[in-house]
Every structure is written in structure tokens, then in C-alpha cells.
Amino acid sequence: MRKLYCVLLLSAFEFTYMINFGRGQNYWEHPYQNSDVYRPINEHREHPKEYEYPLLQEHTYQQEDSGEDENTLQHAYPIDHEGAEPAPQEQNLFSSIEIVERSNYMGNPWTEYMAKYDIEKVHGSGIRVDLGEDAEVAGTQYRLPSGKCPVFGKGIIIENSKTTFLTPVATENQDLKDGGFAFPPTEPLISPMTLDQMRHLYKDNEYVKNLDELTLCSRHAGNMNPDNDKNSNYKYPAVYDYEDKKCHILYIAAQENNGPRYCNKDESKRNSMFCFRPAKDKLFENYTYLSKNVVDNWEEVCPRKNLENAKFGLWVDGNCEDIPHVNEFSANDLFECNKLVFELSASDQPKQYEQHLTDYEKIKEGFKNKNASMIKSAFLPTGAFKADRYKSRGKGYNWGNYNTETQKCEIFNVKPTCLINNSSYIATTALSHPNEVENNFPCSLYKDEIKKEIERESKRIKLNDNDDEGNKKIIAPRIFISDDKDSLKCPCDPEIVSNSTCNFFVCKCVEKRAEVTSNNEVVVKEEYKDEYADIPEHKPTYDNMKIIIASSAAVAVLATILMVYLYKRKGNAEKYDKMDEPQDYGKSTSRNDEMLDPEASFWGEEKRASHTTPVLMEKPYY
């Protein structure tokens, strides 16, 4: 056994040595061999013909008689551009004795910055109507909000009513339309609760006491158990009012209820179910709608403020371009544009309901037009025997660009991958606050990324291995826009970007290898697809040291396990008592049938089929 241990240990050390130092080959001799990215262009010339031979031009690398072959010359760039203003010395990323090759890798410098605008990923549920999860209460399944980001400015409008949705729900002998959506009064009071009251209530709770006000409000609402069912994972939503610093727990999770089958807009019929819908309204601009799943770090990962001097775009091989296919609407201001985006955003509202005709009208129209399906739907309404549990997962028209000059709101459903610097635009999302704006466009992002990529690439090539003329070779990334035009190394004179508050320059004479399709999808051009067939979508990291450390640690762990095993073999094996198996705790009642009851528990004795069902909407009695 000891011999086996020694053999395994020696093998482990040999494996570690191979990872760190290889088997004698010089990695730097072939820096692009077996590489998926950053390969020099040998077959495709990305520059116009007049720039293929920079030695024939006025500005060169001071190597007129160097005798370089054509393959080397086609990658060279003139150092100074005719008519270009020289950049300050500290901003010039290249020296005059360097040969520049252009990378093939079409990376996106905006990836990290734009992560919070990937709403499908960061929010993961509906926005206009959020019913993204199901939970069981007292043996019955209900839907509930589940979005991971706050929805700023969202509220509920009760149709034809002076009652606001933050009014406590009607209880006992009250008429239905006398109440709203909020939790009824309790002793002690749990809703509404001020920020100071919540801080005091949770002052000894290490997990809650230091949370921000929105997350604290969400967790406070999540502490309430419906119907005293402690086994239920149903959690109430909440609304936080920034103006008075109050957290309102919502007893009703439904956010939309329309149609003559489900509600009555007649205000005089006080005890009939009211109609309601979600909205971003002037009355709600201080409100924030919260689900049980709001993440603790929402300020970092979720959008809140709108972006001034910016418009959402798509990153297309070196530059951020306009989204070509959008839906355009008129909007007097940013608030109206944000409201429009919200109305068209991702929604979990069920689709199977009739929101216009009453049962009598449907029967009448059915006989008149000999439409049997219409007559059938009056007696057997859609949803009565089949629950419509549509979940958007955050997919929808969640983004918009507002043009302050033309007063047009451009709305689209494709995830933006970059920002365009434009003084006439404000970028907004359905999650964002309808009014709040920030003006901090990252003007240095491109220049910083160019520098970072060159430094990263320098680890893969020998910068000190100069050619006969003392020239160094660097690999420049495919970024063709920057506030430092010298960093672009453009074969033509870069153009100034109009309406740019960052004073950007763009290089337009380099052929693009990608394009945008009719459905707003960025794809590699046909002539370059073979070259990019084996390149992964995501840029690999070059932090080889992390891989080495991880591999070494794994080998060390293996060696330690072997040592412990051999040590234990020397003596008698110790006997360990098995932990007692956990006792069966109370479990919520499970349903054997998959066809859940789709009828809403609307207030009153009669149950009606509803498109909002199954949502917990029971009248509380005391």
C-alpha cells in the first residue's frame, strides 16, 4: 500500500509539473496555436486597397527599406493620420516602432456594464403583471409574484372608484368596493409599517436589520403566513412608498381583472367585484412594487434610473449600432415613454378569457351568427376546466429609447448589448423609475478596454522578441470607436461621431464581419462563417494562473486524502454513530390530480371562472 501511495504521489507531482511548465515545449513560440481567439488575419484583408501597403504612404513605421514581406505589410497601420490631432503622450497606446495586427475575436466591451439590462435574466418574471410562481395554501395552488427586481412606479388602478389600491381590503360586512388591496388592520399592526418601525422590529435579526428599505419591506411581507399555514411557501407582495417611508403588504396578489364575466365597473353596485389593472401613473411615481424574491443586491444588478445621453443598441463587430426594427410611439416626455414600455412589457397575465362580451351577448351573437363555439363558451367559459398559467419568464418589450427632440418612444423586445452616446436620447426600461435620470455615460470604456485587451494579449506573445528592424508586434482588439482616436489605429482618418457628448471617433473603413438580421439578431457574415465556426461565443479568460492554482490544489487534496487513508489503516477503524434520521415534519397536503381548480375564490358565495385564477383573493373574516 505504501508503494502504491508513493507511486500516486509521484504521479500527482508530475501532473502538477506538467500543468505549470509543460513537457519541454516553448508555449510562446506558437502563441496562436490551438487558440480560439486573437488569431492574426492571414487570409482576409480587412483594409481598403489603398491601405494594404502603408509603406507607400506618407506616414510609415520608419522602415521604408526593411524588406518586409507582403503578409507582414498587410497588417501594418500608419502611425499618424493626415489631418489628425496628436493625442497626449500618456494616451497614446502604441509606439512608432510597433507592428499592429487586428484580432479576429469579436468581443463586446459592454458585457459587464449591460448585465443589469438583461431583464429576462436579472428579473426572470413578468413586469406589467407578475405571477411567475405557484404556491400551495391549505391544499390549494395559487399564483404569486416572483420578480427579482423592484418595479419602480408601478401601482394598481381600480376602475371607476375613488378607492386607492393601498386601502385595506374589505372585511366582514363591508362592501367589496369599499376596500382595496392592502392588508387589513391587525393587532399588533403589521401593515402599513414605517421604515423606522421595521428597523426596530428586526433590530436583533442579523439577516434582516441591515437591509436597504426595499429589500427590508419585501422580507417583512414574506414573514406573513396566509391562513396560518406554516408549511406554505406563499409570500405576499408589497409596495414601498418612498414619500412617507412606509411598507404596505398587499393582501391581493392579482394585478389585473377585466371583463364582464369577472368584474363589474358599475360603481353603484358596491358589493360586486371591482375591475382593476396595473399601471405607471403620476399617483404612483413614489411607489415601488416588490415580490418576495427581490434580491439583496438589487441596486447593483437591477436597473433603476434612466440613462441620459444614451440609447440602447446592439454591438456589431467593433461598434454599437442602432436597433433597426423598433415600434415607434409618440410621447410628450420620458414619463409617457416609460409608461408605454411598461404597458407592453413582459406579462404573466393569462390569455384565456373574454374581456368584452357578457354571457347573454355571447349567446345572442352565437345564435345570430350560428356560432356554436360562442354559445358553448357562455356555458363552459375558457378557463373553467383548464387553468391558464402563462409565465413570461421576463420575455417582452422591456426596453425603450426616448428621443427628446422628436418626442418619439422607440420600443423593442431584443436584449440590448451596448449603449450609443447620443445627446438627444434617454434609454429606459419597464423596471426603471418613470422620472429618475442619471448622466454618467462611460466615455472612457472603449479606450480602457483597448488598453486592457492589449495588455492581456501581451501575455500570449513575446513583446521583447523584436524583428530585425527593432519592431514589436501587438494584437489590437476589434473596437473601432473611442474618445482617443490614436488608440483606434484606423487605416483612414476616424470620423467624429455626431451628437456625442463624449467626443467619440469612429473608424468606418474597416470591413465589418458581422451584421444585424431582420429580427434584430447579430450574426457573422456569410463570407466569414467558416473562420468563426469553431470559436466559442464567449471570450475565454487568460488567467492561466487561476487554472494552475486550482489544478495544484486538486492534486494536493488527492495526496492528503491518500495520506489520511493510509494513516487510518495502521490502527483499528474508528466506529462512528450514525446520526438519527430526521423525523417527519408536517408537510403540506399534496394534490394527486394535475388539473388544478381554476376557479377564483372571489368574495361572495359563488365562484366564477377567472383569467386571473388561481390567485388568492379571499375576503378575510374575523
Curated annotation (Swiss-Prot):
Cell compartment(s), UniProt: Membrane
Segments for region (Disordered): 577-607
Q: Which residues form a coiled coil?
A: none
- Which InterPro entries does its entry note? Apmem_Ag1 (IPR003298), Apmem_Ag1_dom_sf (IPR024056)
Q: Which residues lie on this side of the membrane: Extracellular?
A: 25-546
Q: Which residues are glycosylated?
A: 286, 371, 421-422, 499
Any one GO CC term of this protein is: membrane
Keyword list, A-Z? Disulfide bond, Glycoprotein, Malaria, Membrane, Signal, Transmembrane, Transmembrane helix
Keyword Transmembrane helix applies: yes
Bilayer topology reads:
Single-pass type I membrane protein
**Cystine connections:** 149-302, 217-247, 263-275, 320-418, 337-409, 443-502, 490-507, 492-509
The leader peptide range reads: 1-24
Residue ranges annotated as Cytoplasmic topological domain = 568-622
Mark the transmembrane ranges. 547-567
The similarity comment for this entry is: Belongs to the apicomplexan parasites AMA1 family.
Q: Its function?
A: Involved in parasite invasion of erythrocytes.
Kindly provide the name given to this protein in its UniProt entry: Apical membrane antigen 1
Species of origin reads Plasmodium falciparum (isolate thtn / Thailand)
Q: Which gene encodes it?
A: AMA-1
